[in-house]
From Swiss-Prot:
GO terms for molecular function: nucleotide binding; oxidoreductase activity, acting on NAD(P)H; polyketide synthase activity. The gene is iccB. Belongs to the zinc-containing alcohol dehydrogenase family. It comes from the Eukaryota. GO terms for biological process: ilicicolin H biosynthetic process. The keyword ATP-binding does not apply. Keywords: NADP, Nucleotide-binding, Oxidoreductase. This is Trans-enoyl reductase iccB. It is an enzyme of class 1 (oxidoreductase). Gene3D superfamilies: Medium-chain alcohol dehydrogenases, catalytic domain (3.90.180.10), NAD(P)-binding Rossmann-like Domain (3.40.50.720). InterPro entries: ADH-like_C, ADH-like_N, GroES-like_sf, NAD(P)-bd_dom_sf, PKS_ER, Trans-enoyl_RdTase-like. It comes from Talaromyces variabilis (Penicillium variabile). The keyword Oxidoreductase applies.
């Protein structure tokens, strides 16, 4: 550890189900040889942060996924690593502004999470913040970009875009994004458009305009009793791919009704209700964004997953592509609401997210006023 770094920092710790508390005497995360250490400027709250703290708490673990900040230390093997330079990415150096996501509430690594003054992250799995983007905005992107990459290019096996789309969205295959008003749904719409597909989405009327601006070729009100039938009619019974960003019985039923008579693939962002798997011609699966790190997920069932090395490989490839898209300004961040109070206020924000009180935006909390003011 660099002698100029503190030996302890402040972090938001999991105490029990839906119970978090600020600890001011926590050891800094251990920097693995291929990790970097980031001083956190801002964080944003994801649904998984609140849900996992309630459903599968890891007492003593640091909470939080999404962060932005400044690199303050690098692991011993990072300078020898050629992955980033070989793939046309800027090497990570001390002083760089970066953003990304980590596995918070991790029972196998309780010292590390985004809701803290410092966070450790693999050097391969972090993005540089482009010029003109502030820490607050950057903190909203990590989990959404990573989850969309795994969902589309690993679990749906779609071809990854290079830089910009070469296919016309007017002629590409349809892909349904259920929940286009969510952060991940909005990201999926954009990436699908860039990749040359025709994204269609379900959302509220309040989110429909934004979804269209992002690239959705059609929007449908999920509250309509004929939503599934309308989707199937619009796609001419040809829909074979559905990404469910809500994942409950109602959303799964609509996705299954929308998929064409030949069937297809249904990918959820949570463990899906088995009772809603009603068609043999549809292959269901679900994504946990933390599988991108290539380690087991030791949460309670059904969220206990073995390591998936193939997810790590896809994530590494996607991070390279996504950095180019972000640098070119092709990715629009989700709307956000910035709240004050730092780490001590995050618990209240997590509760608001858990209760479904935050819609169409992400909650952001500045952690280091010094870094945010200097940016």
């Amino acid at each position: 550890m660099d002698a100029t770094l503190p030996s302890i920092h402040t972090a938001l710790k999991i105490l029990g189900p839906n119970n978090v508390s600020v600890s001011e005497n926590t050891a800094l995360p251990v920097i693995q040889p291929l990790d970097i250490l980031v001083r956190v400027a801002c964080i944003s709250i994801n649904h998984v942060d609140a849900k996992s703290a309630d459903m599968s708490p890891s007492p003593g673990a640091t909470s939080g996924t999404d962060f932005s900040g400044v690199v303050v230390a690098i692991g011993s093997d990072v300078p020898k690593e050629s992955f980033r330079s070989t793939n046309g990415m800027k090497p990570v150096q001390i002083g760089d502004r970066v953003f990304g996501g980590v596995f918070g509430n991790n029972p196998l690594r309780r010292d590390n999470g985004a809701f803290a003054e410092y966070v450790a992250v693999p050097a391969r799995l972090v993005w540089h913040i482009p010029g003109g983007m502030d820490f607050s905005t950057a903190s909203t992107l990590g989990a959404a970009v990573a989850t969309v990459g795994l969902s589309l290019f690993q679990y749906m096996q779609l071809p990854m875009p290079t830089t910009t789309s070469t296919a016309s969205p007017d002629n590409g295959p349809f892909v349904l994004v259920y929940g286009g008003g969510t952060a991940t749904g909005a990201m999926a719409i954009q990436v699908l458009k860039i990749a040359g597909f025709r994204p269609i989405t379900t959302c509220s009327s309040a989110s429909a305009g934004h979804a269209t601006e992002l690239g959705a070729t059609a929007t449908f009100d999920y509250r309509s009793p004929t939503c599934g039938a309308e989707l199937r009619e619009h796609t001419g019974d040809t829909l074979t791919l559905a990404l469910d960003c809500i994942t409950d019985t109602a959303s799964m039923n609509i996705c299954y009704e929308a998929l064409g008579s030949s069937g297809g693939r249904y990918v959820a962002l949570d463990s899906f209700p088995l009772r809603a798997h009603t068609r043999r011609s549809v292959v269901p699966d679900w994504v946990c964004t933390y599988s991108q790190f290539g380690h087991p997920i030791a949460w309670a069932a059904p969220y206990n997953l073995e390591a998936r090395p193939e997810d790590l490989l896809t994530a590494e490839a996607w991070y390279v592509v996504a950095q180019k898209l972000i640098d070119q300004g092709l990715i629009t961040p989700h709307p956000k609401e910035e709240r004050l109070g730092g780490l001590a206020a995050i618990g209240e924000g997590m509760e608001a997210v858990r209760r479904g009180q935050i819609k169409g935006k992400k909650l952001v909390y500045p952690i280091s006023n010094e870094l945010c003011a200097a940016a």
